[in-house]
């Protein structure tokens, strides 16, 4: 995705430059086996996408420019579309449970895509009672229209928005 490599590098640089800023760093990733209609030869880039992040391929790995060592990686979307990190799990533990077990009450959300996975994860974090900030300089979105709509939804839900997203 356009801007994804720069986002991965920028996340790594920020975490390295401020190692005491976060108690925990976790990652989420698409981890597709057979997500059905989520994959399409003619994607609409809203509900359907080209094949990506397929288990057993290099594409499922976190980008090599993301040099952060996450405490846990939450896989999502094996057999159906999943946008929120809260739909995934790490070794059988879902993100909400992991955050509760680690007494997390605030979270910064970063990554791709601003208008899909970042939005869904941030909204679910707020629903879980977590004080949520999206660091927009560390995100990249699919399209200007969907990013603008997502930013409105995030703001309306009480998510703190900092910076400006990159848009492909």
Please report, for each region that a protein language model flagged, where it lies by residue.
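Active-site acidic carboxylates
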Residues: 1-77, 101, 127-134, 142-168
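Short, well-ordered alpha-helical scaffold segments within catalytic/effector domains
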Residues: 8, 92-96, 119
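Short, surface-exposed loop/turn motifs that are enriched in glycine and acidic residues
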Residues: 51-56, 84-88, 111
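Short, small-residue-enriched loops and turns at beta-alpha junctions
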Residues: 81-82, 139-143
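Glycine-rich anion-binding loop/nest that anchors nucleotide
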Residues: 104-120, 136-139
